[in-house]
């Protein structure tokens, strides 16, 4: 039973570390709801830098 707990904790640590690395790679990109300067800014796939009247934000792009 103790070895199962150790393996489980090791697996969780590996998953958390992998998620943290992907966040570091995306740090320069804007996230949904974050300000952006233009369409040239890096929004996630399926998002565009759109105006909300006051500023530009990464928002879902539902097509043309």
From Swiss-Prot:
GO terms for cellular component: extracellular region. It comes from the Eukaryota. GO terms for molecular function: toxin activity. It is found in: Secreted. Keywords: Cardiotoxin, Disulfide bond, Secreted, Signal, Toxin. The keyword Zinc-finger does not apply. Residues 1-18 form the signal peptide. Disulfide bonds join 29-43, 36-49, 42-58. Belongs to the scorpion calcin-like family. The presence of a 'disulfide through disulfide knot' structurally defines this protein as a knottin. May increase intracellular calcium release through the activation of nuclear inositol 1,4,5-trisphosphate receptors (ITPR) of cardiomyocytes, thereby causing an increase in the contraction frequency of these cells. This is Phi-buthitoxin-Hj1a. It comes from Hottentotta judaicus.
């Amino acid at each position: 039973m103790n070895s199962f707990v150790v393996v489980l904790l090791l697996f969780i640590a590996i998953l958390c570390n992998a998620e943290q690395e992907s966040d570091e790679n995306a740090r320069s990109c804007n996230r949904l709801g974050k300000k952006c300067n233009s369409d040239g800014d890096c929004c996630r796939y399926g998002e565009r830098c759109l105006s909300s009247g006051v500023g530009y934000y990464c928002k879902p792009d539902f097509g043309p």
